[in-house]
């Protein structure tokens, strides 16, 4: 059955579009992994910053933290 599916996929004609041709160079590194940690620490800092931001916003919304002189009306 798998050979039939691959035979069918070989016969189908792939439609090439302008957008596809423009984006093809961006996909040329598909499947390749850079050695080491890469940008993982930057992503960790971004995630931690977003978590702190979310906690601050939730505490302000929940009135756990009040800001003096700033009226909150929601």
Swiss-Prot record:
The keyword Transmembrane helix applies. The chain crosses the membrane at residues 41-61. It is a single-pass membrane protein. The modification Phosphothreonine is found at residue 3. GO terms for cellular component: chloroplast thylakoid membrane; photosystem II. InterPro entries: PSII_PsbH, PSII_PsbH_sf. One of its GO terms (molecular function) is phosphate ion binding. The keyword Repressor does not apply. One of its GO terms (biological process) is photosynthesis. It comes from the Eukaryota. Its main location: plastid. Phosphorylation is a light-dependent reaction catalyzed by a membrane-bound kinase; phosphorylation occurs on Thr residue(s) in the N-terminus of the protein. Keywords: Chloroplast, Membrane, Phosphoprotein, Photosynthesis, Photosystem II, Plastid, Thylakoid, Transmembrane, Transmembrane helix. It is found in: Plastid, Chloroplast thylakoid membrane. Belongs to the PsbH family. HAMAP family: PSII_PsbH. PSII is composed of 1 copy each of membrane proteins PsbA, PsbB, PsbC, PsbD, PsbE, PsbF, PsbH, PsbI, PsbJ, PsbK, PsbL, PsbM, PsbT, PsbX, PsbY, PsbZ, Psb30/Ycf12, at least 3 peripheral proteins of the oxygen-evolving complex and a large number of cofactors. It forms dimeric complexes. One of the components of the core complex of photosystem II (PSII), required for its stability and/or assembly. PSII is a light-driven water:plastoquinone oxidoreductase that uses light energy to abstract electrons from H(2)O, generating O(2) and a proton gradient subsequently used for ATP formation. It consists of a core antenna complex that captures photons, and an electron transfer chain that converts photonic excitation into a charge separation. This is Photosystem II reaction center protein H. It comes from Huperzia lucidula.
């Amino acid at each position: 059955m798998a050979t039939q599916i691959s035979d069918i996929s070989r016969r189908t004609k792939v439609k090439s579009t302008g957008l596809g041709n423009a984006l093809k160079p961006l996909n040329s590194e598909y499947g390749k992994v850079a050695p080491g940690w890469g940008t993982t620490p930057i992503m960790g800092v971004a995630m931690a910053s977003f978590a702190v931001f979310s906690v601050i916003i939730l505490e302000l919304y929940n009135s756990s933290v009040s800001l003096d002189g700033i009226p909150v009306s929601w």
